[in-house]
Each structure stands twice: as C-alpha cells, then as structure tokens.
C-alpha cells in the first residue's frame, strides 16, 4: 500500500481520446507535494507518511507546525495530510511526489469537501417529488409530507430524509480513471467530476476496489 497525494482542484475541461470522442475531465494541480514527516511501528505503532502541499505564510502557520516543517527542512505548507502505507513504501522526509506518481488508465479514489448549498428543502436535497399542484394542496407543494406514524412508534426515526443543511461534507468518489498526467506542469486529469469547488484541496489515492470493476 503506497502513499496518495494532495492536489488542488483547478476546474473542469474536456479532452479528446484516440477515437475522437470528447471526455470530460477534472484538472488537479500538484504544488510542491513533499513528505514532511513519517510514522514508524517502533515509534508510533503504525507506518504512515505525512505529506504537505502548497505554500503558507510563516505568520499564518502555528508554532507547532513551524517546528515540524523546520525539522523536515521544508517550507511551511498550506495543506497537510497523512497516508497509511506499508513498511516497504515509506518515503524519506523531504521527498517530493510528482504527477507521474499516477499512470494514465489507472483507477483512483478521490476525497474532497463538497460545495455547500446551505439549508435546502427535501425536493432539492433528496430528490423528493413534492405534493400535488392542486386538489386541496395549499402552500405545501414542495414539502416532504408525512414523517412517521401515530402513537406507534410515536416518534420520527433517526436518519429520516428531511430538509436540512446540504453539501459541505467529506465525500470520497471511488474508481475514477486517470486520463493523463503532465509531470512538467504538475497536472493530473481525472475523468468525470471530483467533489469540491475550484481551489479546493483534494486527496487522491490508489483505488481500493479497482479489482471489482
């Protein structure tokens, strides 16, 4: 099990494959993705690498993190994430990971924070059909309707689909295909949509369920 990477979402575009078909892709940019710390079985009880990406001003970095970056002899990073790895995949502190870490055609799992939509109704949030337009329905056309029974069970069950805060949640999209990479510019082109807004930090790992596809 090897390390993933931290990348920044640039936006979406499309490219053409060898058959002349256009493929929608999300462009991710890797900006100075370096190993800033390691975790070992002897010292921590597990093996992992801690990566940092982007650039942060020293004044905006906490004193503890400044110390960590100084020990690793790297510039302060805007985003830090830890990846569990097998013992033979541990990397030296200061090692930079580039876009060539992934190959075209490979499947990856992508993690990001979805765009927040604020408080949303049941129709927008869960795709409910709403109530009828006429025949006695007044004001409640977009409501979710009944939420439970009567005295038995006498409550609304947990996880009932209702109106509420939509988006801004941590989401992992599995088995997305890497269309191509550009190591010189640090770009990874992934087929389809990736959770998060433009400029958001994204975690990209090797797919864990790729054998099933």
Swiss-Prot record:
Record's keyword annotation contains Ribosomal protein: yes
GO terms for MF: rRNA binding; structural constituent of ribosome
Residues bearing PTM N5-methylglutamine: 151
Keyword Ribosomal protein: yes
Sequence intervals crossing the membrane: none
Changes after translation: Methylated by PrmB.
Annotated Gene Ontology cellular component terms: cytosolic large ribosomal subunit
Secretion signal span: none
Gene Ontology BP, a term: translation
PROSITE patterns in the record: RIBOSOMAL_L3
Protein family membership: Belongs to the universal ribosomal protein uL3 family.
Function: One of the primary rRNA binding proteins, it binds directly near the 3'-end of the 23S rRNA, where it nucleates assembly of the 50S subunit.
Summary of subunit composition and partner proteins: Part of the 50S ribosomal subunit. Forms a cluster with proteins L14 and L19.
Protein name, UniProt field: Large ribosomal subunit protein uL3
Natural source organism: Rhizobium leguminosarum bv. trifolii (strain WSM2304)
Highest classification ranks of the organism: Bacteria, Pseudomonadati, Pseudomonadota, Alphaproteobacteria, Hyphomicrobiales
Gene: rplC
């Amino acid at each position: 099990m090897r390390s993933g990477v931290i990348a920044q979402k640039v936006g979406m575009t499309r490219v053409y494959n060898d058959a002349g078909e256009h493929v929608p892709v999300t462009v991710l940019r890797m900006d100075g993705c370096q190993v800033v710390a390691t975790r070992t079985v002897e010292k921590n009880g597990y093996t992992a690498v801690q990566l940092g990406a982007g650039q942060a001003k020293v004044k905006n970095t906490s004193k503890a993190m400044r110390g960590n970056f100084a020990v690793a002899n790297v510039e302060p990073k805007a985003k830090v994430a830890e990846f569990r790895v097998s013992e033979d995949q541990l990397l030296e502190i200061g090692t930079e990971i580039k876009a060539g870490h992934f190959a075209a055609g490979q499947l990856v799992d992508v993690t990001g924070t979805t765009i927040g939509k604020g408080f949303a109704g049941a129709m927008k949030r869960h795709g409910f059909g709403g109530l009828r337009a006429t025949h006695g329905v007044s004001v409640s056309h977009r409501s979710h309707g009944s939420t439970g029974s009567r005295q038995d069970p006498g409550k609304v069950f947990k996880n009932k689909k209702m109106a509420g805060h939509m988006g801004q949640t941590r989401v992992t999209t599995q088995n997305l295909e890497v269309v191509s990479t550009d190591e010189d510019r640090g770009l990874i082109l992934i087929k389809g949509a990736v959770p998060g807004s433009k400029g958001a930090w994204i975690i990209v790992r090797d797919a864990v369920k790729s054998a099933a596809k």
